[in-house]
């Protein structure tokens, strides 16, 4: 059994990412109930009824003036406690030579805009013969977003997709009415010592798009431009910020930004109806408030929020439209509880399609 398969077994015993968690629209006042969850098995999203076609990403490495910083210079930033409404600590599972930190869903906060699932995996160093080994499993009514800093994962799905993902790429898998996928490693990767470090997030789909045809989209890193904003390299992975629009497909207003800051560098953050800042590495300061490594700051809607790096840091900013009520159980998310029950019955009865090239194994529905 590979390491990622172990993650599923162990996280099912943890009081996070409830398998049957009801997520109300006013989720700030109704924390998720404790329950069982598993890696790559929980999430949510909602948005506009019309699907947006993204614009083409601008070219690489152009220095741009930060419009958020311009606003701050005119009227001053929002800082400290006024900017941070909640500070989340990760639920960490140690798997020996691998760890996973889960930030969403959490008891204090279930969703940020359309984002409902946020896992930070690694960094992990694997010896030969160990690594990523997630057997085929299903999803409905959501989209998975995988982004790596180091390493490689091999994606297969029931549509016939076969796609390695490497650092800088985005893999967007739209489950829609139902998809099955696995995440493993190419034999040549698994045969040698290797490292893995990255983020896996989930979005739920707008009610009007929950039952769309499943799809898989791969965006090479070269198609996602790096911009230098106030001296810091910034990548707009999804949505629009800093005058840049990502080519990655969205179904609702969605924001996903990665940035790297050197010690002492400052960055004004873009606006969004809801937003949260995750410290992948390093330490940040927001006014007089310290944001430690692996913490997630739920930010206010104030337009001007500026962070400063106490040490060399990497950050991920997520946000977007707040969502309506969603249910979540195992790998299934839906606005309708009965739809999840149907998905469970279909998986139990073997009615989902198989993954070509990975037909021999599957993850059973948890008891």
Write out the residue ranges for each language-model feature.
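Short linear motifs in low-complexity or flexible loops
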Residues: 5, 15-17, 21-25, 30-34, ...
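Generic extreme N-terminus detector
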Residues: 5-7, 67-68
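Jelly-roll (double-stranded beta-helix
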Residues: 39-367
């Amino acid at each position: 059994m590979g390491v990622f398969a172990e993650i599923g077994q162990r996280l099912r015993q943890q009081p996070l990412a409830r398998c049957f968690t009801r997520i109300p629209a006013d989720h700030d006042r109704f924390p998720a109930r404790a329950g069982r969850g598993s890696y790559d098995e929980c999430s949510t999203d909602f948005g506009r009824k019309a699907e947006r076609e993204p614009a083409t990403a601008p070219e690489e490495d152009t220095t741009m003036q930060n419009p958020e910083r311009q606003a701050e210079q005119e009227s001053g930033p929002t800082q400290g406690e006024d900017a941070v409404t909640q500070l989340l600590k990760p639920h960490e599972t140690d798997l020996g030579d691998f760890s996973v930190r889960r930030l969403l869903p959490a008891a204090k906060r279930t969703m940020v805009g359309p984002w409902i699932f946020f896992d930070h995996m690694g960094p992990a160093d694997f010896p030969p013969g160990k690594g990523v080994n997630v057997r085929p499993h299903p999803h409905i009514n959501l989209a998975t977003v995988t982004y790596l800093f180091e390493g490689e994962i091999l994606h297969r799905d029931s549509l016939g997709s076969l796609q390695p993902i490497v650092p800088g790429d985005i893999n967007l898998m739209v489950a829609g009415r139902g998809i099955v996928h696995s995440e493993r490693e190419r034999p040549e990767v698994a045969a040698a010592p290797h490292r893995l470090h990255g983020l896996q997030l989930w979005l739920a789909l707008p009610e009007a798009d929950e039952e769309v045809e499943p799809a898989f989209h791969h965006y090479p890193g070269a198609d996602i431009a790096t911009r230098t904003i106030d001296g810091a390299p910034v990548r707009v992975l999804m949505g629009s910020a800093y005058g840049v629009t990502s080519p990655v497909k969205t179904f609702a207003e969605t924001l996903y930004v990665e940035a790297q800051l050197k010690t002492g560098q400052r960055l004004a953050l873009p606006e969004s109806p809801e937003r949260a800042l995750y410290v992948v590495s390093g330490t940040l300061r927001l006014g007089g408030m310290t944001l430690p490594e692996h913490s997630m700051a739920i930010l206010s809607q104030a337009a001007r929020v500026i962070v400063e790096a106490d040490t060399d840091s990497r950050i991920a900013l997520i946000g977007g439209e707040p969502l309506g009520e969603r249910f979540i159980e195992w790998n299934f998310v839906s606005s309708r509880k009965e739809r999840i029950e149907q998905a469970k019955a279909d998986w139990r009865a073997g009615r989902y399609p198989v993954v070509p090239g990975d037909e021999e194994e599957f993850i059973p529905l948890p008891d």
